[in-house]
Amino acid sequence: MSAPLPIETNELPHRYTAAYANAMEVKWQDALRWPDGNGYGHRQPNPGEPGFDGSKPKFYCLDMFPYPSGAGLHVGHPEGYTATDIICRFKKLKGFNVLHPMGWDAFGLPAEQYAIQTGVHPEVTTKKAIDNFRRQLRRFGFMYDWSREFATIDPGYYKWTQWIWLLAYESWFDPSTKRARPISELAERFARDDAEFATEGGSRTRWSAATPRERQAHLDTFRLAYIGEQTVNWCPKLGTVLANEEVIDGRSERGGHPVRRMPLRQWMFRITAYADRLLDDLALVDWPESTRTLQTDWIGRSDGAEIHFAVEGEREPLTVFTTRPDTLFGATYMVVAPEHPLVTRAVARDAGGKLAEYVAWAKNRSDIDRQASKEKTGCATGLLAVNPATGARIPVWTADYVLMGYGTGAIMAVPAHDGRDFEFATEFALPIVQVVEIDGARFTGECATSGEGRAVNSANAATLSIDGLFTTEAKTKVIAWLESKSIGTHRVNYRLRDWLFSRQRYWGEPFPIVYDALGNHYPITTAALPLTLPPLADYSPVESDTPQPPLAKATAWTHTTAGAAGVDSSLLPAHTPVVRETNTMPGWAGSCWYYLRYCSPSDASHFVSPEAERYWMLSRRGGGSHETPTTYDAATCHAGGVDLYVGGSEHAVLHLLYARFWHKMLFDLGHVSTPEPMGRLFHQGMITSYAYQRADKSLVAVDEVTERSEGEFVETKTGERVVQTVAKMSKSLRNVVNPDDVIAEYGADTFLLYEMYMGPLEASKPWNTRDIIGVFRFLQRAWRLAVDERTGALLAAAQSDPKIEKLLHRTIHKVAEDIERLSMNTAIAALIELVNAATRPTGMADPTQGGMTRDQLDRFARILWPFAPHIADELGARLGVQGVGFYASTWPACDAALLVDDEVEIPVQIQGKIKARLMVSAKATAPEIEATALAHAEVVAAIAGRPVKKIIVVAGRMVNIVV
C-alpha cells in the first residue's frame, strides 16, 4: 500500500517533517482500521477460530491496565506500553501468535470522589475518561488487539468477578493437602463424623444437634471468603472507613475530621492460608529480586515458639509468639495490646481509672501512628504473670506499640536485647537482664544489644540450662523444654493478615450475598449474576456515628425476597424477606483476574474459555514442540502463564500478591492451568519531569519560574533563586507533559523512540522535550536513506557495500538480543550506528553509489518496525511490501559468520599502563600478536631499549610487557 501523502510546499516536498510524519501515521492507522471501526492492526484469533495457526508458538504479553483518570495520559504513562509494543511486534515477526490486549481498571475510590466533587455520576466520568485514553493509545499506533477490550465496570465482566468471589465463599483451604477444596466436602465430612465444635456462645455441640445458624457459623471459620470483625478507622463526617495512611494524629488526612477506631464486621479473604505457597512459589517465576524481597517481607514468615505464661487471677494463660525463645530468661515484663481480652477484663475492674483512660486513647490511634511514634507510652494493668523459666512474677503492661493484629497481641519483653523493649523499660524503670553475649557488642546497660550469640544468665535450678549455647542450639533446646512441660510449642508466624475486602462506598462491585432477618447470609446463584450496581442519584457517604454505605439508600434494591434475589430455594424459601449486602468490593477485585478474561472476553458461559486459557497460559519450557500441554507438569512447564507482565513497581506487593492468591485458588479448584499467573515480570522506571526547589526544599510550580541564564532559575514573583530538580509529574507543579502536544510537534514514531532511548527501561529518568530533536533527526536520516526528499522516489545503492552488509547483520543480531532483554535504548543505539554508517556523504551526485541496496533497506525497515512502525510501514510500501505494512512479514535472518570480527583491537600494556593499541586478525596466534606488538613504533618508543623480562599475551584480549 502506498497512498499519496500531503506534499510540503517547499523545495523538499518529501522531507520527513512533523507534518509529514503526522500525516503518514494517520494514513497507516486508517489503513489498518478494522471494517467494524472498533480497532486497527493486530487481531489474534483463538484456537478453533478462523485464521488461527496452531503451528506457531504463543507469546502472551500484558501491560498493567490503566485506571482512566479525567486528566488523560501524560508522557510517563506510555513508557511500559511502548516497550511491550516493541517486543510484541518483534515476536510477531519471529512467527509467534501474539496476545497483547488492553482494557480499563475502572471501579474505585478516585472516580467516586471526583463524581462527588463534580456532581457527575462516576459511570459518566469514567466512560468519558476511557474514551480519551483509548484515543491517545490508538494515536500512538500500538499493536493492541482491541477486539479483547473491556472495562472492569462492564456488567459482563464483573459478573465473573462476583462468580469468583462466590467460588471463594464456597471453598475452604485443606491444610492436609495445602489446597482449596469445596466447602460442601467439609460439610459432608462434619455430618459423616458428627463433628463436635464450639459455638459462638462458647458452648460445645455436635453437628447433628446444631442449628442451621450454628452450622453456618462453624463453616464460616473455614471459608476462604468469610465475615470477620476488624478494627477500622471510622470517620463519621466523611461517612467512610479510612486506611491507616489516611489518618494523621486521630484526624482524617482529607478535611482534618475526627476519626475513631471501632470494630466492624466485614467480608474478608483468608489469604493467610496461602502464605507458605505465596512465599515458596516466588522461586518458580522470573521476577525482579526487589519485588520478591518486598513480597517476602510483606508475608513475613518467622520461625519461633508460642509460650504460655500463667497470669495470677486469670483462668487462661497469656500466650505470646517470639522468634527468640532462647531469650526467655531475660523476659522481665509482658506487654499486651490495648485491644487484648486480658486488658478488656482489667479495664472492667478499673472502670474510670488510668488504665481505662489510656486504653481509650490508644485504641483511637491508627496502627501506623502507633508503630511510628518515638515516644513510648503505656500503663500497668495491675496483673502479674509468671516467667516459666525463672519462676519470677513479672508485671503485665499494655502499650500502643503492640498491635492486636500481629501474632497473639502480646509480647514477652526482653529489654536487654530489643530496642523498643529497652526504651519502654527505661521509661518506666523496669528490670533489664542480659541473657545473650554477642561477639563485639558489650552490654553496658545504655542500650539494647540485638543479634545472635551465646546464652548467659540462662539456667534454672530445675530442668533447663542453655548457658554457653549459641542461639540456634539454644532455641531448639528451649522449645523442646517448653513442649515437654506443655507450656509452649514450635510455631511459624506470619506478618501477612487476612485481606479486608469490604468498602463502604458506592462505585464498586456489589457482593452477591443477602441476609435474612436473623443475620444469616446466603449466596445468590450463578444464574442470578451479574448483580448489577443500582443507579443512585445520591452516592455521597452518609455522615453517621455508625457505618452506613451509600447503597443502603437504594432501599428498593436492598430490600427484596430470597426468590427475587436469586437465592437457591433449598437454602431459603422464595418468599422470605432478605436484605442485600450494602458494602461493595474494593478496586483490587477487578484487577485480580483480568489477565484471564483477555483470553476469551466474549465467552458468556465461562469466566475464561478452558481451551483458550490452556493455550495462552500453559506452555512448555525450552521451546521445542508448540503443541499445548493438556495439564501442568512442574518438571516441563512454565509455572506462570503470562509470558511478560510489565508495570510499575508501586504494584509490587498488593496487586501482585492479591492476583497470585486468586490464581492459586482457581488453580486448586481446577479452573486454571498454572500455579502462578505471571511468568516474567518487569518494572519500568518512572519518567519524571523537571521541578524547582526553594532553599527550604519546598517546590515551585514550573510556570512560576524564570530562567535567567543557562542553568540559573529564579521564582518569578519573588526573585528568589531556585534549584532545578526532578519530581513526579503532577497538576500542582504544573510539570505534566501531554503526549498529544509532543506528537503534534514531532510525530508518534519520534515520541515512541525517544521514550525508549532516554535510558535503561528500568531506570527513572527526567523528560526533556529539548532532547527529542536528536531522535527526530535520526528518523530524518533513516528516511533520506530510502527516499528522495525532492521527488519521493526510492533511493537504493546499486551494489552492496560489504562493510554495510556486515554491520547490518550485526545490527539484526544485536537488536534481537536487546529486545528480548528489554534493553531498548541499546537496540536503538545500534540502529542509529547503522544509519550513520550507511548515510551518503553530503553532495553525492549519484545516490546509487552509496547508502543501502533495496534488499538491505527492506531488512533495515523490518528491524526498525517494532520501534517506529509508521515510518517503517511507509518505507516497506515504497520497497514493494505487499499487504498492509509489515504485519505479515518476518524478522530478517543474520549470517553467523558475519557476526565475527575479522580484526580485533588489542591494548598493549607496559608496566601496567596502556601504551599502544593494535589492530590484528581475529585469528592471530599469540606468537603473531607478540611479534606485531614488539614491532609497533609506539611500543618500541616506550620500551626505549630496556630489556624485556616478560611478555604475556591473552589472544584476542591484551598484551602485557614487563621491562
Where in the sequence are the language-model features?
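Helix-rich, typically C-terminal accessory recognition domains appended to large enzymatic cores
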Residues: 105, 176-180, 221, 226-233, ...
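N-terminal catalytic cores of NTP/NDP-binding nucleotidyl/phosphoryl-transfer enzymes
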Residues: 47-122, 126, 150-161, 322-323, ...
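Long, charged, mostly alpha-helical binding arms that flank functional sites
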Residues: 15-19, 120, 124, 301-306, ...
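Flexible, glycine/threonine-enriched loop-and-boundary segments that flank and lead into catalytic domains
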Residues: 290-319, 363-392, 396, 499, ...
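Basic, alpha-helical terminal appendages of large translation-related enzymes
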Residues: 1-35, 46-54, 337-340, 349-352, ...
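Catalytic alpha/beta core of large soluble enzyme barrels
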Residues: 84-85, 97, 340-444, 452, ...
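Residue patterns forming the tRNA-binding/recognition surfaces of aminoacyl-tRNA synthetases
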Residues: 2-21, 25-40, 117-318, 325, ...
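Conserved oxyanion/phosphate-binding beta-strand-loop segments in alpha/beta enzyme cores
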Residues: 2, 11-62, 92-101, 125-131, ...
